[in-house]
Structures are given as structure tokens and as C-alpha cells.
Swiss-Prot record:
Phylogenetic classification of the source organism: Eukaryota, Viridiplantae, Streptophyta, Embryophyta, Tracheophyta
Keywords attached to this entry: Repeat, RNA-binding
Disruption phenotype: No visible phenotype.
Species, as recorded: Arabidopsis thaliana
Top-level taxon of origin: Eukaryota
Official protein name in the record: Double-stranded RNA-binding protein 5
Annotated Polar residues bias: 347-361
One MF term in the entry's GO annotations: double-stranded RNA binding
InterPro entries reported in the protein's UniProt record: AtDRB-like_DSRM_1, AtDRB-like_DSRM_2, dsRBD_dom
PROSITE patterns in alphabetical order: DS_RBD (PS50137)
SMART domains in alphabetical order: DSRM
Residue segments, region Disordered: 220-251, 335-371
Subunit structure: Heterodimer with DRB1, DRB2 or DRB4. Interacts with DCL1 and DCL3.
Function per UniProt: Binds double-stranded RNA. May be involved in RNA-mediated silencing.
Length: 393
């Protein structure tokens, strides 16, 4: 703020830009700064130490502006530069709003002739009235009144003894003393209500937390004292996990050949024993983990898909069918004991049987005639066999 104004004054006056030098004192955790500014060959120092370097430079620039504005030759230029932006009016309005007061009221009075008018302005803030210097325009008169009010408020705030406090905050603290009693009473009651409501909400939260802690501790103690291992198994999450599947048997042929001779009854007994052992292991792990998780009421939970799992029901064992390779049947071996005569007799039998079948199938024969023919054929066949046997011997 003050540094910008001093720089603008130097540019309009065709002077060199102001240069700042700083002195640091105190420890690293609480340093203090004091600055000095060189403006057109003149050096102006900050009156007190400041907590930051920026505050010290602004304090030095403020001292230089106050000194330059008090001099007659450059008073008009300095006042013009200081009031062109209307910074003091803005500062006065912001500070009054921060202090919770009404905005400042400006009253201007015109004097002089019509060709050369003059204006004097007074500003009213917090029950106090401040009068500024007269000016040729109404706007400039209001700015002068704001400058007078700000300078008097700074003197009241005694900034020299409170170097670490910002200027605007100090002025706001001074203005807050001039609040009406009703406003201050209203603010205190509002603050008290806020504090009490916050304390009540904090108490409610604390009571709710304590109630939940007591409830959980009571559940833990009751479950640990009265629950059995089966109840732990029901309330534990691990009990809901199905047992691991039995190891898959190899489908290689030699491995199957080892167990091919076993009966189905033995296989059933072995699978039953494996299921019992796996179930016992799962029960042991579930009871061990349920002691670590006493608050887990896992009867409510379901697996993904919405299907609940019963820890007692086990899936039936899957029996793999043994793969037996199928080979083609070997061709029949020729009988070396066969003679040509036997072959001829077999051929004769075949032909005779065919002839007999054809004779029996002839139309016009009755049932009795067919029976007689079959008996004669059987006799002829038996006689031919006897003749063949005698011939062979």
C-alpha cells in the first residue's frame, strides 16, 4: 500500500525509484525487522521493529510519505497521489464493517463563490466526528476527511507500543470499543449460545460413543463367557468358507492301473474319511479365528450372489471314473487240428441245413409234415457224423 504510493510519487516527480535496506534481529524462531528507505537521497527509517520484512518496509514508506506531505513544495502532489485511489475511504469502510459498526457518513459543506468554490467535509463514525481540510472538489474533501479520521484513529490505537499488530486490525479493535451497549450485549449472547450449542453437541457425541463402547464390551464379555466352540464357529467368518477340495487324482494310465483293482466300497470309505478330516481342520481354524474376532456376527453375511452358505453341509465328493483304454478284438486263430474231411462235412452240413430250411419254407406243407421232415433230417445228420468219425479213426 504505502510502498506503491511512494513508488508512484517518485515516478511522477521524475526521481529514482526508492530503495530499501533491512536490519534483522532476534532468534530464528522469532525474528524482528527494521527497514529504511532511500527516496531522492533522503533516508527514512521505520519507527519500530516489525515481525515481518514487508511490514517494516511499509512502515518506512509510511514515514517518508508523512514527511513529504507535510512539506509545502510537494504537498499538493503528494496529497494528490495519496488520494487519487481513495485508499483511506476504503480502509475506513472496511475497518468499520469489521468492527461491526455502521458505515461512515460524510457531510460536505460548500463555501466560496461560484467561480472558485470550496468544500469542507466531515465524517461521522462510531459517534465521533472528524473534519478534513477544505478542497476544490467534493470528492477530494471527502478523501481529506477520511485521511483525518484514519490518522486520529491510528493515534488512539497507539500503534507504537503494538508494533507486531497490523494497522487495520488495531484500528478495528479501537472502533469496537465504541459499539452500542445493545449491539455488544447481542453479540455476547450470540457467542454464548454458539458455545453452549457446540458444547452440547460435543457432549452428545461423547455420550453416544461411550454407549457404543459399553455395548460392544458387554457383547464381547457375554460371547466369551457363554459361547461354545460351535457358537464361535457359527459367528466366525472363516466358518462360512467351504473346505478345500480334495486333491485331484492324476488321469495318467499307470496311476489308474494301481487303483483299478480296488473295490468301490473301499473308495467310498476313503473319501468319507478325507471329508471328515478336512471338516475337522476347518472347524479348528474357525474356532481359533473366532476367538480373535468376538464381535463378528457373521450369520448375517452372505457371499456374493446372494446365496448363503451352511458351514455344516459339505458338497458330495466327486468320483472320477477311471479311463480304461479300449482296444480292438484280436482276430480268431485258425485251428490246426482241422482236417479237410471235417471241413467238407461242415460244408455238407451247412448245405444240408440250407436245403432243409428251403424245403421247410416251401408253401403247401402242413405242420405235421414239417415235423416229420425235421426228424428225418436230424437222423440223417447224426448218421453222417458217425460215419465221419469212423472214417477218421
Amino acid at each position: 500500500m504505502y510502498k506503491n504510493q511512494l513508488q508512484e510519487l517518485a515516478q511522477r516527480s521524475c526521481f529514482n525509484l526508492p530503495s530499501y535496506t533491512c536490519i534483522r534481529e532476534g532468534p530464528d524462531h522469532a525474528p524482528r525487522f527494521k527497514a529504511s528507505v532511500n527516496f531522492n537521497g533522503e533516508i527514512f527509517e521505520s519507527p519500530t521493529y516489525c515481525s515481518t520484512l514487508r511490514q517494516a518496509e511499509h512502515a518506512a514508506a509510511e514515514v517518508s510519505l508523512n514527511v513529504l506531505s507535510s512539506r509545502v513544495p510537494s504537498k499538493s502532489l503528494t496529497a494528490k497521489i495519496l488520494d487519487e485511489t481513495g485508499i483511506y475511504k476504503n480502509l475506513l469502510q472496511e475497518t468499520a464493517h469489521r468492527a461491526g459498526l455502521d458505515l461512515p457518513m460524510y457531510t460536505s459543506v460548500r463555501s466560496g463563490s461560484c467561480h472558485f468554490p470550496g468544500f469542507s467535509c466531515t465524517v461521522e463514525l462510531a459517534g465521533m466526528t472528524f473534519t478534513g481540510e477544505s478542497a476544490k472538489t467534493k470528492k477530494q474533501a471527502e478523501k481529506n476527511a477520511a485521511i483525518a479520521a484514519w490518522s486520529s484513529l491510528k493515534k488512539m490505537s497507539s500503534l507504537d507500543s503494538q508494533d507486531e499488530e497490523k494497522e487495520q486490525e488495531a484500528v478495528a479493535r479501537v472502533l469496537s470499543r465504541f459499539k452500542p451497549k445493545e449491539v455488544r450485549r447481542r453479540e455476547t449472547t450470540n457467542q454464548w449460545r454458539r458455545r453452549t450449542s457446540q458444547q452440547d453437541s460435543n457432549k452428545d457425541l461423547l455420550i453416544e460413543r461411550l454407549r457404543w463402547i459399553n455395548l460392544l464390551t458387554n457383547q464381547a464379555s457375554s460371547s466369551s463367557s457363554t459361547s461354545t466352540p460351535n457358537q464361535h464357529k457359527n459367528s466366525s467368518f472363516i466358518s462360512l468358507i467351504p473346505p478345500p477340495p480334495p486333491p485331484k487324482s492324476s488321469k495318467i494310465l499307470p496311476f489308474i492301473q494301481q487303483y483299478k483293482d480296488r473295490s468301490s466300497q473301499e473308495a467310498k470309505t476313503e473319501t468319507a474319511t478325507e471329508m471328515i478330516n478336512s471338516k475337522a481342520k476347518v472347524n479348528e481354524t474357525s474356532t481359533r479365528l473366532s476367538k480373535q474376532m468376538p464381535f463378528s456376527d457373521m450369520n448375517r453375511y452372505n457371499f456374493v450372489g446372494g446365496c448363503s452358505v451352511n458351514p455344516y453341509s459339505l458338497a458330495p465328493a466327486v468320483q472320477m471314473r477311471s479311463v480304461i483304454p479300449v482296444f480292438a478284438a484280436p482276430p480268431p486263430k485258425p485251428n490246426p487240428n482241422l482236417n479237410p474231411s471235417s471241413l467238407s462235412s461242415s460244408v455238407n452240413e451247412f448245405t444240408s441245413s440250407n436245403n432243409s430250411c428251403s424245403v421247410l419254407n416251401t408253401p403247401g406243407l402242413g405242420g405235421q409234415e414239417k415235423k416229420n421232415l425235421t426228424r428225418e433230417m436230424i437222423k440223417l445228420g447224426s448218421e453222417s457224423r458217425i460215419l465221419d468219425q469212423t472214417h477218421d479213426s
